[in-house]
Amino acid sequence: MKKYILYILTGVAACGLCSCEDALDRYPKDRLTPDNFFHTEEECQLYTNDFYTMFPSAGTIYGETADIIAKTTLTSEVLGNRTVPATAGSWKWEKLRDINFFLQYSSNCADEHVRLEYEGVARFFRAWFYFEKVKHYGDVPWVDRPIDAGDPLLFEKGRDPREMVMQKVIEDLDFAVTNLPVERSVYRVTRWAALALKSRVCLFEGTFRKYHGLKDWESYLTACATASKRFIDESGYSVYTTGTTPYLNLFSSLKALDTEIVLARAYNTAIGLKHDVNGYLTSITMGRPGLLKNIANMYLMKDGTPFTSQPGWETMQLPEESKNRDGRFAQTVRTPGYKRIDDTALSAPNLAATMTGYQLVKYLQSAKYDSYNASTNDLPLLRAAEVMLNYAEAKAELGEFDDAVWNATIRPLRERAGVKGDRPATADNYLKTYYGVDDCDLLEIRRERAIELLLEGRRYDDLMRWHLGEKLNKQWYGIYVPALDTPYDLNGDGTNDVCFTKGDAGNETGVSYIQVGGTSLYSLENDTNGRLLYTVGRNFEEKRYLRPIPQTALNINPDLGQNYYWK
């Protein structure tokens, strides 16, 4: 029983295998009825523990692409080749039945405090469930009771308006905020996790409505600002600043650091819960992810000025462009001086493991975790920095941004990274061109989101809500290469690391020879020099802001209707 509870507490894998056997022996599902269950706190906890399996997988969190990461393995969202499927994992409803089953019979628990707490847990997860559904499909059926196969509701109910469903989501989150515990726990949902989720949900919905021409966006942004401000003022969470590389430590730490992290997926070798972030970031066969040049350019100089205001920035090589930058740059990608955890040797970017030359190190632990599926560092789901950024953006979108908001949100994030934290007076032209807006504060907030939340699964949603899906079609650029057939030192240790060529590989010891042009995945922007290009066909269209309803669901219930552009 204890092993089962620990397993589910981590919220990182579906209930199964030997870790569930004790629990299933004690509470066989064929005898789990409303009359004999949900009477005690242990029973309520045991049942609701399974809800934690709804959280995104590790690869979904760190494996994002959007317009920030290039890799060889791409999702249909990025490729733009999604068609109307027969079925879809994102249209599954089983977890909703489990949640509603609990809420229907939780009154069996006579202890009101316990009952309300676990109803808060269930409603937190129902809000999470429906937020994901609305992001993917827009209008969806709202169901607040358990339904089984054969229930007429399955065949007759159409989709409810997005507005109605989102109001229900907010009602669930408000209930969770009121009834969940205030004590910190990175592995269990709390009041602070509910406020952080409400902050995320309301920012998404408010800005999606604003940039997609829907009404009532102001009320959602006001709700975001209110929830975020309460979190900032009352939760006690803050930006983690310990050590010389606090940003990197926040993600490479084996155990979630609860100074800043509100909710995390836990991993534990002892009970077989592991992921593969080390392999993903270092292997030559797992997609070869690399930061894109357009995002690398967004990292500021330490004095707070844009990198793109430096003379000659367009043709700087990696060692030069890494100097005097926002500390998060060197804590996100390999730059001169980088050493693996528990190693004293300098590690240059490996072009066989990264498509762009900007090899990622966020989350990366020591080399002993490099083998397949061996990583055990916890992965953050909600953290204080995101809530701060949500607050800043909501206030900016509402026209209520000022120095006080800047100082409570953007300044501490930049100062942790060793960047001068003053609020800029003029808009950065590079950002204006990239995002197509002129507001200086809004641009700086978008800069911070791109940098601070990179590889945390937020970027695709950001582009969708800002109505910037076309960014997924842009050319992918990597590091600048001055010339072909010339070996380069990428990490400044005096030893050459890489050479780009159209001919045969050379034989200089320690140099990786990268073929460009012809049938290679690579080319150079100006044929013989320039930014590294990685080209793959992508086709984002307006209809891809929402997914199509699966055909099987429409066959069963035509009243669901298909999303407009997918008809």
Place the predicted regions along the sequence by residue.
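C-terminal motif of bacterial Sec signal peptides marking the signal peptidase cleavage site
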Residues: 16-19
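Short coil/turn linking the two alpha-helices of tandem helical-hairpin repeats
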Residues: 134-135, 141, 184, 204-213, ...
